[in-house]
UniProtKB/Swiss-Prot annotation:
NCBIfam families: PRK00517.2-4 (NF001786), prmA (TIGR00406). Belongs to the methyltransferase superfamily. PrmA family. S-adenosyl-L-methionine binds at residues 130, 151, 172, 213. The keyword Lipid biosynthesis does not apply. One of its GO terms (cellular component) is cytoplasm. Transmembrane segments: none annotated. The gene is prmA. Pfam families: PrmA. Methylates ribosomal protein L11. InterPro entries: Ribosomal_L11_MeTrfase_PrmA (IPR050078), Ribosomal_PrmA_MeTrfase (IPR004498), SAM-dependent_MTases_sf (IPR029063). This is Ribosomal protein L11 methyltransferase.
Length: 277
């Protein structure tokens, strides 16, 4: 562990969800969400991310003709034990019959326990999109299904699918994410059928259920590959999407059957089905 770390504080009311979505796309490993504030902590300099956020906010302000209320600060701090402080702030969460907890918390009986520690990769179950995905997977995934997690991040959804009895493949374009997924799988005593760093382009296998909890722009880019990865009658769960993209999602996936939409604050998730012929 290095002696110092960088802490980037991003405060905004007008562009909170958009900037949070942008931050997710940067692939940083430790994000804390507060009321109208996003805090990023890393051991490498975050000045490029700070610049990107500032430019993005300027663009949003110009296009939408609303005030730019962004306040941003970047500080170099002594690395006393910020991860320890973060641990104290992370609480377990129950999502239907799945209990997500950090390793230092006790297990909960009568439900499926998933252990996810902070600072590995995104996905602790607290964010609306991940929470919605967990609810939807419990509803549509069946034991024995083949499943694909696109953009697996921390591996929380892959692990949930495995614990639901699915045969799971997972991928992410970020090698740190795939390594985090493998570490978390080992922590939870589950195994994936296959995991790789890369995309789903030219993927030959088809699945009973495919989940993509990633930002909307990437979903649009991968839309054809996502559709091709479905078996007849298979389910596609899309999440990580701000509600402003709802109409565009519906248009992009109109050749599939829309089964369910789940709204959580400004975030929306979709369940589609590949229609049987």
């Amino acid at each position: 562990m290095k002696d110092k770390f960088y802490e980037l504080s991003i405060k905004t009311s007008n562009f909170y969800d958009e900037i949070l979505e942008l931050v997710f796309s940067f692939g940083v490993t430790c994000v804390e969400e507060l009321d109208h504030e996003i805090i990023i902590r890393e051991e490498y300099d975050l000045k490029d991310i700070a610049w990107g956020v500032e430019e993005y906010a300027k663009g949003l302000s110009s296009v939408r003709k609303i005030s730019n209320d962004l306040k941003i600060s970047l500080n170099l701090k002594e690395n006393k034990d910020w991860l320890g402080e973060y641990k104290r702030a992370v609480k377990p969460i129950l999502v239907d019959k799945i209990y997500i907890r950090p390793s230092w918390e006790e297990s909960l009986s009568g439900v499926t326990n998933i252990i996810i520690d902070p600072a590995l990769a995104f996905g602790s179950g607290h964010h609306e999109s991940t929470n919605s995905c967990l609810q939807l997977l419990q509803k549509y995934a069946k034991s024995g299904d083949t499943a694909l997690d696109v953009g697996c991040g921390s591996g929380i959804l892959s692990i949930a699918l495995a614990k639901l009895g699915c045969k799971v493949d997972a991928c992410d374009t970020d090698e740190q994410a795939t390594q985090s997924s493998l570490s978390n799988a080992q922590l939870n005593e589950v195994k994936f059928n296959k995991i790789w760093t890369g995309s789903i382009a030219n993927l030959e296998q088809k699945y009973d259920i495919v989940v993509a909890n990633i930002i909307a722009d990437v979903i649009f880019m991968l839309s054809n590959d996502l559709k091709k990865s479905l078996k007849k009658g298979g389910y596609l769960v899309l999440s990580g999407i701000l509600n402003k993209y709802e109409d565009r999602i519906k248009d992009t996936f109109k050749d599939l059957e829309l089964v369910e939409i789940k709204q959580a604050n400004d975030w929306v998730s979709f369940v589609y089905k590949e229609m049987d012929e």
